[in-house]
């Protein structure tokens, strides 16, 4: 038997080696196929956009051509031919205008089109650099809105509540992901995160304010560029407040309306450029300085978890079965030593090989009745494969291929201890009393994983993670006084709605100081709601109902990108309106510098001075820059949400500072 096992292990090893080698050989082919999958629809979409762009210049040329032709023809043959020529030019683009009008009448189609083109566009990699789906969606949405207005005079307007809802869903889903790590992250890097926030805010203000002064731009551009480069629209409102309440007096000959237009222009240009720029910068910051974002993210997760090997209750992957060295085998009972003993008696004799199923004459027996085992019964045992192969015939009988006996579903469940009857029992004692058919996978206390030692005593509030058949799990749950939380695809919407509602209300509360309104912000409020919800679930998995990881991941992904698509429809036309003379160039330069230099400097300080993990430092920097798309970019690049741990702290700090800075930037303009 041992030699057979050795042969089996060797065969598996060879197969694995061959499989890996084959993957290495076909990797370029797989890449080509994957690239083609994205390029085909993308090229078609880009061809359409290119055609529309060509139409824009063609329209301008045609109008000029028609105008000159009209003058010539009217001199020779009258005005009728000129009018006909003009009508033909207009009618030739009618079908395309109809399409753009349709997007205006059906804004939902506008959003879906931006997503459909933006996602594959963001996945295209040139020299190892890609935009990512968020920047791709933003770029496509801006292009469509610009073409629609400048060629056909169509302005797209999508209700702001749409973008607000999707942004809040994204923030809540992100909070659910990082909740258990948030508080441990604050303990280890709180001071560093505050310093990073101060660096980003102060450098942004200095670059934008003095950049406007050096460029000789008019009043109003400074707060507008700060607002756009920081992507905080509320700064515009603060600057407008300084205008309307008389705190700022416009220079002679300059109206408040003109200053308001300058604020809007500075915001529109710098907003889009800084949004795309910060996504690219944050995405590749660790790699720029020689760090592997995936490896660093894994290291950060390990450090923040305190060396725990299992995800905390409620976290992604916490209820996945994973690998187990235990296997299911079925045997036909043939030994007198076993015949006549009940399932429980067999468990006490051989706890390392519990019987999980008994088949008698083709029918399953109810294990709860604890009937004696008879000769010829087929029993299913879950234990170490090697032990079964070596000792199976000696203990039970010959192995059986009965499908009914071997078809035993195995579950993973978290059980919160609610009974004081078991409080103080050691794991060894629990194993003897309730361990039938179960494997203890992990033990958590206050969200922290504890080592599985035989002498460890359990307490009320502890969470035990078991692997085993549903019948065994239910029996253990009754004894422990808890409800087993199993892996589920169902999401409890009630708790999500309540949590998001509380977070929204908390974030919308504001107070005035010296005429400046201060508020945490509804998006940050929903983020904190998600953080606290997952934090409490890590201590009691019964709290908050089930939240499918698939549903959470979908909310995070689609929420942000739908928000960006709606935003693109609004800001696109304003960009073209602001491009005149050298003003637009200066605004673009100052805005990009104000958006990218501060987080770059803060990142360097974080990894060099405070010795922060590169992914955590990137998360702190993007939080200090108030860039949710930037956070999503580093999460995608590192394949982890650990970058979001410092995000709420730096986000909240710099939101307040940026509002104050925007107000004083207007006063000093």
UniProtKB/Swiss-Prot annotation:
InterPro entries: AAE_transporter, RCK_C, RCK_C_sf, YidE_YbjL. It is a multi-pass membrane protein. One of its GO terms (cellular component) is plasma membrane. One of its GO terms (biological process) is potassium ion transport. The keyword Lipid metabolism does not apply. GO terms for molecular function: monoatomic cation transmembrane transporter activity. Residues 316-397, 398-483 form the RCK C-terminal domain. It is found in: Cell membrane. Belongs to the AAE transporter (TC 2.A.81) family. This is Uncharacterized transporter DP0386.
């Amino acid at each position: 038997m041992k030699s057979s096992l050795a042969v089996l292990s060797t065969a598996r090893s060879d197969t694995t080696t061959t499989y890996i080698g084959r993957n290495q050989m076909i990797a370029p082919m797989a890449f080509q196929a994957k690239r083609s999958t994205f390029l085909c629809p993308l090229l078609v979409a880009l061809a359409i956009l290119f055609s529309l762009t060509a139409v824009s210049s063609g329209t301008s040329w045609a109008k000029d051509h028609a105008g000159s032709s009209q003058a010539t023809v009217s001199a020779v043959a009258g005005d009728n031919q000129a009018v006909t020529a003009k009508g033909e030019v207009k009618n030739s683009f009618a079908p395309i205008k109809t399409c753009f009008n349709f997007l205006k009448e059906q804004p939902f189609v506008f959003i879906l089109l931006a997503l459909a083109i933006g996602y594959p566009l963001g996945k295209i990699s040139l020299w190892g650099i890609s935009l990512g789906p968020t920047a791709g969606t933003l770029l496509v949405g801006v292009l469509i809105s610009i073409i629609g207005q400048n060629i056909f005079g169509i302005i797209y307007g999508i209700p702001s509540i749409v973008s607000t809802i999707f942004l809040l869903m994204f923030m809540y889903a992100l909070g659910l992901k990082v909740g258990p790590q948030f508080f441990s992250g604050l303990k280890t890097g709180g001071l560093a995160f505050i310093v990073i926030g101060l660096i980003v805010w102060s450098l942004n203000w200095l670059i934008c304010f003095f950049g406007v002064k050096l460029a000789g731009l008019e009043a109003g551009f400074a707060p507008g560029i700060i607002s756009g480069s920081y992507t905080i629209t509320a700064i515009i409102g603060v600057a407008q407040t300084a205008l309307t309440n008389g705190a700022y007096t416009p220079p002679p000959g300059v109206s408040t309306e003109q200053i308001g237009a300058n604020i809007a222009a500075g915001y529109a240009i710098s907003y889009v450029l800084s949004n795309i720029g910060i996504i690219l910068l944050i995405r590749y910051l660790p790699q720029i300085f020689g760090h592997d974002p995936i490896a660093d993210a894994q290291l950060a997760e390990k450090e923040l978890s305190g060396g725990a090997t299992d995800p905390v209750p409620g976290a992604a992957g916490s209820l996945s079965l994973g690998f187990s060295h235990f296997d299911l085998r079925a045997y036909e009972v043939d030994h007198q030593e076993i015949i006549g003993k009940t399932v429980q008696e067999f468990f006490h004799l051989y706890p390392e090989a519990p019987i999980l199923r008994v088949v008698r004459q083709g029918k399953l027996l109810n294990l709860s009745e604890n009937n004696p085992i008879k000769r010829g019964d087929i029993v299913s045992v879950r234990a170490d494969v090697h032990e079964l192969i070596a000792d199976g015939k000696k203990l039970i009988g010959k192995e059986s291929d009965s499908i009914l006996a071997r078809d035993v579903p195995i579950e993973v469940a978290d059980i919160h201890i609610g009974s004081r009857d078991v409080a103080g029992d050691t794991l060894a004692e629990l194993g003897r009393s309730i361990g039938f058919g179960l494997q203890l996978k992990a033990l958590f206390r206050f969200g922290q994983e504890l080592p599985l030692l035989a002498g460890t005593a359990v307490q009320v509030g502890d969470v035990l993670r078991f692997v085993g058949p549903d019948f065994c799990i239910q029996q253990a749950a009754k004894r422990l006084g808890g409800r087993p939380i199993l892996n589920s695809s169902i999401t409890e919407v009630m708790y999500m709605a309540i949590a998001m509602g509380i977070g929204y209300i908390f974030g919308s509360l504001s107070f005035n100081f010296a005429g400046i309104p201060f508020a945490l912000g509804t998006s940050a409020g929903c983020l904190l709601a998600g953080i606290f919800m997952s934090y409490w679930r890590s201590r009691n998995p019964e709290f908050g109902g089930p939240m499918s990881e698939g549903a959470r991941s979908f909310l995070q992904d689609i929420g942000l990108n739908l928000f960006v698509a709606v935003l693109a429809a609004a800001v696109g036309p304003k960009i073209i309106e602001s491009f005149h003379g050298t003003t637009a160039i200066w605004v673009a330069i100052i805005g990009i510098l104000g958006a990218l230099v501060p987080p770059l400097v803060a990142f360097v300080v974080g990894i060099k001075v405070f010795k922060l993990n590169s992914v955590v430092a990137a998360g702190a920097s993007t939080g200090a820059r108030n860039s949710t798309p930037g956070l999503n970019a580093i999460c995608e690049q590192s394949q982890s949400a650990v970058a979001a741990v410092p995000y709420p702290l730096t986000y909240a700090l710099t939101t307040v500072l940026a509002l104050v800075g925007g107000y004083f930037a207007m006063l000093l303009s």
